[in-house]
Amino acid sequence: FKAIFLAGGPGSGKSYIASKTAGGHGFKVLNSDKAFEYLMKQAGMSLDMTKMSPEEEAAKDVIRDRAKEMTAVQKKAWCQGKLGQVIDGTGRRYDKILKLRKQYEEMGYDTYMIFVNTSLESTIEWNKKRERKVKEDILIPAWQDVQNNLGKFQQLFGNKDFVIVDNTPDIEKGTEGATPQDLDAIWNVITKDFAVRPIRNPKAKAWIETEKGVCSIERAPERVTDQYGSPSERPAIPGWRQAEMEKERKGK
């Protein structure tokens, strides 16, 4: 009943940050990009989307739709199992996150957000180095949209359920992004403030109480003796069946 939303521009290092912070808590990572990359490789297509022909663009769009379908099936199964999840997205569309967060909360989930912040310059450089490259005319507007949503996300999730990770390289310190100390701090915040805290969502609490009630109805088998006087077990007879048996006995 815990869901962590990731937000950050393409190439900001969200997946890396998630693996180093939330991953150790057993959260399942929901990311259509993983399925997309797998299907692209299966189709023998390059992940460098800066050099695609119109025909390749069309094929890529079909594969993208298939990846989304696969991820939706995965999400449904994990939600049915009430499993903790990391929703790995860019956060470019505020309305999409707003709707998705509401869906999870309607299912009983507590929600949290990790916002991975980077400078535009470092985002462009990382995009050049990674296998799945995005065109800059898509990358730059996406980065700007995410930055514009920062304040909205902070207000939506609240200070207690929102954390910012600065993953911008520091030339003076010689770091390529968030330091091990930064990641340790985020790990501690997630552990203390979210992953292990008691569930707050009333819907989840009600579901848990219902499950407890179902379990309490199941009585232990009765200890009886067989025809030879030896101890044996038989399933407990439900109350409604006992009443019927009593009526049958009196009717004879």
Label every PLM stretch briefly:
Residues 92, 105-126:
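Conserved phosphate-donor/acceptor-positioning beta-strand/loop module used by diverse small-molecule
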Residues 4-5:
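Short hydrophobic/aromatic beta-strand immediately N-terminal to the Walker A/P-loop
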Residues 34-36, 92-93, 117-122, 169-172:
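Conserved nucleotide-binding/hydrolysis micro-motifs of P-loop NTPases
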Residues 27, 85, 111, 160-162:
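Hydrophobic anchor at the start of a short beta-strand
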